[in-house]
């Protein structure tokens, strides 16, 4: 059960049989009818386990309504006893120093259904026909996969997580000067940022157009390396087993960094300059300014050197 924007992720997981989408795009009587229909479908399935990964009230109500054999969530400081008593088991409250992959698996550990000490790797299933379609698209735009292919994801809905346009343009120019093909990916909302990067780069990258989340996952799967800001792209690359460089600013990479696979986290620290001793601060930019100096002052060559090292190119 998920929000509409998360549905494509579960569609790419071959272990998921049914996906129930929360009808938050509806309103009025249509929303009520959609929820009733959703509850009927869930009740009909007689699920044995309900694992609720957020502190949303819908999970507590579902647990009481469906009465599964096992229900579990995590402790939520802002919820009261009614919410907490809706579940048979409770995992510990979120920890800001542990990977989220581990903390999600804590729910299964709390029920004794998962006994391993390390969480499994992310996994998505990319079908051969999707790869074939993507390779045809690349060939149509002059990329034959005989050179190394790097995919860049530069944009975020939270601008304090972004590096300057000029930084990305310099990274692209350096990579392409070494005969590395570069594709800049992103959603429709990212197109303005991507166009600015394209305009600023001397050696032009290929931009994705109207790509779905599945298209993007497939692109990552055929790439040799993904370079991304702190975003879902980090985890999408990990899930398709492609090496990833994840560039972090205010966010704590101990929580949200890549999980398993081959990766490198780049983030400025006190070792680079005293002014970066505050990172990660967890703020929306320096003093709430929506601009993060730990990203603004990131040297392009620092990213390029790491990329060449991971691609084994010198």
Regions found by a protein language model. Give the residues of each.
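Catalytic machinery of carbohydrate-active enzymes
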Residues: 1-314
């Amino acid at each position: 059960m998920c929000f509409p924007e998360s549905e494509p992720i579960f569609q790419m997981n071959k272990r998921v049989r049914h996906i129930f989408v929360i009808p938050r795009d509806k309103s009025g009587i249509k929303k009520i009818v959609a929820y009733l229909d959703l509850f009927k479908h869930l009740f009909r399935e007689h699920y044995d386990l309900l694992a609720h990964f957020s502190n949303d009230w819908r999970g507590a109500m579902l647990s009481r309504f469906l009465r599964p054999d096992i229900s579990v969530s995590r402790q939520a400081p802002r919820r009261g006893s009614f919410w907490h008593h809706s579940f048979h088991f409770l995992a510990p409250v979120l920890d800001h120093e542990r990977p989220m992959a581990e903390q999600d698996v804590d729910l299964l550990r709390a029920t004794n259904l998962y006994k391993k000490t390390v969480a499994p790797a992310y996994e998505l299933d990319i079908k051969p026909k999707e790869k074939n379609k993507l390779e045809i698209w690349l060939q149509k735009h002059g990329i034959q996969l005989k050179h190394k292919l790097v995919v860049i994801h530069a944009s975020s809905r939270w601008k304090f997580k972004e590096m300057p346009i000029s930084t990305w343009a310099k990274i692209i120019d350096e990579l392409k000067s070494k005969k590395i093909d570069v594709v800049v990916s992103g959603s429709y909302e990212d197109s303005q940022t991507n166009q600015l990067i394209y305009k600023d780069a001397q050696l032009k990258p290929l931009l994705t157009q109207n790509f779905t989340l599945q298209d993007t996952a497939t692109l990552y799967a055929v790439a040799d390396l993904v370079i991304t800001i702190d975003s879902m792209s980090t985890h999408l690359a990990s899930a398709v087993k492609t090496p990833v460089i994840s560039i972090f600013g205010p966010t704590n990479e101990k929580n949200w960094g890549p999980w398993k696979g081959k990766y490198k986290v780049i983030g400025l620290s006190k070792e680079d300059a005293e002014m970066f001793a505050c990172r990660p601060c967890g703020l929306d930019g320096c003093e709430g300014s929506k601009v993060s100096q730990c990203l603004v002052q990131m040297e392009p060559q620092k990213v390029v050197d790491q990329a060449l090292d991971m691609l084994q190119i010198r």
